[in-house]
Amino acid sequence: MVKISFQPAVAGIKGDKADKASASASAPAPAPAAEILLTPAREERPPHHRYKKGSSVGGVCYLSMGMVVLLMGLVFASVYIYRYFFLAQLARDNFFHCGVLYEDSLSSQARTRMELEEDVKIYLEENYERINVPVPQFGGGDPADIIHDFQRGLTAYHDISLDKCYVIELNTTIVLPPRNFWELLMNVKRGTYLPQTYIIQEEMVVTEHVSDKEALGSFIYHLCNGKDTYRLRRRATRRRINKRGAKNCNAIRHFENTFVVETLICGVV
């Protein structure tokens, strides 16, 4: 608080004091000096801005949602590219149209040079192979569809001429696993051609009718569903099949290795 006082003016001439002495004696006493009290003004502070917590939390939420949407877009784009480009290329690499030259040493005639063609589909993830043998140009076997299921350990032959299915345990000494067979065919596709190869023969006998095809697995089930299906047993000892015995046998020539296999199915019903 500041105190300000106002004093009355003092006469500047001494003579006036004497003249006014008498007058001042009779005059009333002068009024006290006027005082004015001034209160210092309060300092004005800038208003304090309070930030709301809700606005910052909302900004974080919007940012998080934006990141989630961006990540989802990247995931869907990756799935699209994988499905329509990578899988398509992989499918093309797993389908093969193959041909192999071999000497037919099983023929009664002199050894002749033969060619065998087949379409191969290899399913690496499902671990099975599917082979289609078209009608041979120069005889030597029936057209057939063959499935080698390495998960079930089974092989199924669908003789297209008879429209019948035959199932037997998978012979892993003859049939290459899907990965090895795929590598072999990829080398052939790249130009590393198979040399002229040879043919071996295996003989099988029909044993019993199969009624429960679902127990054979989904791959063989789809191949043999709606067809008469029979079990086969591999003949342990080789025997020479004459012309009379050959009438009761059907031959399917195929290859899943570096050589050709002739599968004889005998006792066909």
Curated annotation (Swiss-Prot):
List, for all copies, the residue spans of the domain called BRICHOS. 138-232
InterPro entries per UniProt: BRICHOS_dom, ITM2
Subcellular localization is given as: Lysosome membrane; Cell membrane
Among its keywords, does the record have Transport? no
User: Which residue windows are transmembrane per the record?
Assistant: 57-77
* Record-linked Pfam families: BRICHOS
Q: Give UniProt keywords alphabetically.
A: Cell membrane, Cleavage on pair of basic residues, Disulfide bond, Glycoprotein, Lysosome, Membrane, Phosphoprotein, Signal-anchor, Transmembrane, Transmembrane helix
Cellular component per GO, a single term: plasma membrane
Asked if the Swiss-Prot or TrEMBL record annotates the protein with the keyword Ribonucleoprotein, the reply is: no
> Which GO terms label this protein's molecular function in UniProt?
amyloid-beta binding
Q: Where are residues bearing Phosphothreonine located in the sequence?
A: T39
Which residues are tagged as glycosylated in the record?
N171
* GO terms for biological process, alphabetical: negative regulation of amyloid precursor protein biosynthetic process; neuron differentiation
* Residues carrying the site annotation Cleavage: R244, G245
Give the multimer and partner information. Answer: Interacts with BACE1. Interacts with APP. Interacts with STMN2.
- Similarity comment text for this entry: Belongs to the ITM2 family.
Please give the function described in this protein's UniProt entry. Answer: Negative regulator of amyloid-beta peptide production. May inhibit the processing of APP by blocking its access to alpha- and beta-secretase. Binding to the beta-secretase-cleaved APP C-terminal fragment is negligible, suggesting that ITM2C is a poor gamma-secretase cleavage inhibitor. May play a role in TNF-induced cell death and neuronal differentiation.
Name this polypeptide is given: Integral membrane protein 2C
Tell me what organism the protein belongs to. Answer: Sus scrofa
Source species taxonomy: Eukaryota, Metazoa, Chordata, Craniata, Vertebrata
